[in-house]
């Protein structure tokens, strides 16, 4: 079965095609609007691999947490394609995908995505044979919240993601217990989405199309501004 993976949770979007046996192709694009990047990158990937869209048997979508506009574009694109192609869809956590990409370590894994406003989206994972499992649930907060969680766990840690790179000085407060993953792992990859979604699609444990929504973990700037105006009007 060919599965199409889509991730638009950060400033770098990626599209991938893969099967149970191999990755057929992947393209990552940074610095362009997600609306333009997803459509053009998908066309480019299909042309490059010589695969017709109609051969896709399932879709893996990065559902966040991540950037609001990017997540909305990726999730809606994936859902639309799944509806048109009449294929199953699976939502994959962007943090799960980050941790999955460095699963070969024996250390705990701290996956961290830049949430802007001086905050991170983060979760901590433990490597197990064939993958990772969560030690903590996804959360949003300033870097010291993640540092506090890691201090409490008291283990050596591999920190991965653009959030870990951005706040590496704060993470270094833990001394020699924290190693920073290579910049190549700074963003969730669509290929990891495919790997994580494939077993669920094969077992028919896919998501209900209309129940699949982005995981934001906090309100958007527009929602915060609206709340502030509403409170001001009521005072």
Q: Regions from the language model: what does each represent?
A:
Residues 43, 79, 97:
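Active-site phosphate/pyrophosphate- and oxyanion-stabilizing loops and adjacent acidic/basic residues
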Residues 1-65:
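N-terminal beta-alpha supersecondary unit
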Residues 47-54, 82-92:
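Phosphate-handling active-site elements
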Residues 45-49, 84, 102, 193-201, ...:
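Stable alpha-helical structural segments in soluble proteins, enriched in small hydrophobic residues
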Residues 60-89:
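DPxDG-like acidic metal-binding loop motif
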Residues 22, 30-33, 88-188, 202, ...:
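Surface "functional belts" at beta-alpha junctions
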């Amino acid at each position: 079965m060919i599965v199409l993976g889509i991730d638009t949770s950060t400033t770098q979007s990626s599209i991938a095609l893969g099967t149970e046996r191999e990755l057929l192709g992947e393209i990552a694009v940074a610095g362009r609007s997600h609306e333009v990047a997803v459509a053009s990158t998908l066309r480019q990937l299909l042309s490059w691999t010589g695969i017709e869209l109609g051969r896709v048997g399932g879709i893996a979508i990065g559902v966040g947490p991540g950037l609001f506009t990017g997540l909305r574009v990726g999730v809606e694109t994936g859902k639309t394609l799944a509806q048109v192609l009449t294929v199953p869809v699976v939502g994959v956590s962007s943090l799960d995908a980050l941790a999955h990409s460095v699963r070969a370590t024996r250390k705990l894994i701290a996956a961290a995505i830049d949430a802007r406003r001086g905050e991170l989206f983060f979760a901590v994972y433990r490597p197990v044979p064939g993958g990772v499992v969560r030690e903590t649930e996804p959360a949003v907060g300033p870097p010291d919240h993640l540092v506090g969680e890691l201090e409490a766990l008291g283990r050596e840690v591999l920190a991965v993601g653009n959030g870990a790179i951005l706040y590496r000085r704060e993470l270094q407060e833990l001394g020699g217990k924290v190693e920073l993953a290579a910049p190549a792992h700074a963003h969730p990859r669509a290929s990891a989405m495919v790997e994580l979604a494939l077993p669920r699609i094969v077992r028919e444990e896919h998501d209900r199309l209309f129940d699949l929504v982005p995981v934001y973990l906090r309100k958007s700037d527009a929602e915060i501004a609206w709340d502030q105006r509403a409170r001001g009007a009521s005072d």
